[in-house]
Amino acid sequence: MARTDNDTWDLASSVGATATMVAAARAVATRAPDAVIDDPFAEPLVRAVGVDFFTRLATGDLTPTDLDPDATGGAGNMDRFADGMAARTRFFDDFFSDAADAGVRQAVILASGLDSRAYRLPWPAGTVVFEIDQPGVITFKSDTLARLGAKPTAVHRTVPVDLRDDWIGALEAAGFDRTEPSAWIAEGLFGYLPPEAQDRLLDQITELSPPGSRLAVEGVVSSPDADDEQIRERMQAVRDQWRQFGFDLDFSELVYTGERAEVAAYLGDRGWRTDSITATALLEKCGLQSAEDSSANFADVRYVTAVK
């Protein structure tokens, strides 16, 4: 079903299912030899969602080789996807660690999905971690982790609100202090926002961020109309491959393509000092193999860090 202005979802459908997909990839990456991440909550959270395809991946019942027996390395290759998510996860983990070392004690995770950083990272004493996502997503994850006996490693504040609504008011009502430096992440989010919504969100974060604040984002590539069809063909290839295993989701209906601002430049114009790294370089930095076919791993995605 195509996106609408007021669409909602759970973790088994629409955009929510992509959060479960990413958590399954983190579970795969956690089991890997010489793993670069350790997310002990990824597998149980995926199992709790109950999508059979992702549960089988997360538990190891279905392997990346099962999905790609001919080792074609195509767009649906789970080894490549898991490596990409491992590198991405490590990037944002390290970002929060660096922010903590710099003395930042407020962290904000936008569209947190099945992110478990509030439970698995070694936050300094006094750190407050705010998680923002749709109410159903927040409630499901909080309840599931409570049943697992998981305890937050920071002061944990959930903010059950859609980013299209008054999320700033909800965040401040939860105790966020805009006069204190903060560390923000937008991981795997911008592709699900129209270009103008991406700009608006960056402007809002800038407004809430005094000097000393930090931001890390996964920057989506601006795609001219000529590239849209190629992107959709890649997504259709993934859909066709995974449909054989009982999971059918049209990814092309979930994302927004087209021209959009380049994140580092946009932030630089608004007073942030930025740095960035490509997905390919990030994989290599993590000791993971980069894809020869850049279309498979969206190698031109850039991970941006910014300091106010």
UniProtKB/Swiss-Prot annotation:
Q: Cross-referenced InterPro entries, in alphabetical order?
A: Ppm1/Ppm2/Tcmp, SAM-dependent_MTases_sf, SAM_mthyl_Trfase_ML2640-like
UniProt cross-references to SUPFAM superfamilies, sorted A to Z: S-adenosyl-L-methionine-dependent methyltransferases
Task: Identify the keywords attached in UniProt to this record, alphabetized.
Answer: Methyltransferase, S-adenosyl-L-methionine, Transferase
Instruction: Name the enzyme's class.
Output: transferase
EC number(s) from the headed UniProt entry: 2.1.1.-
Q: Example GO biological process term?
A: methylation
What does the UniProt record say this protein does?
A: Exhibits S-adenosyl-L-methionine-dependent methyltransferase activity.
Q: What is this protein called?
A: Putative S-adenosyl-L-methionine-dependent methyltransferase Mkms_1061
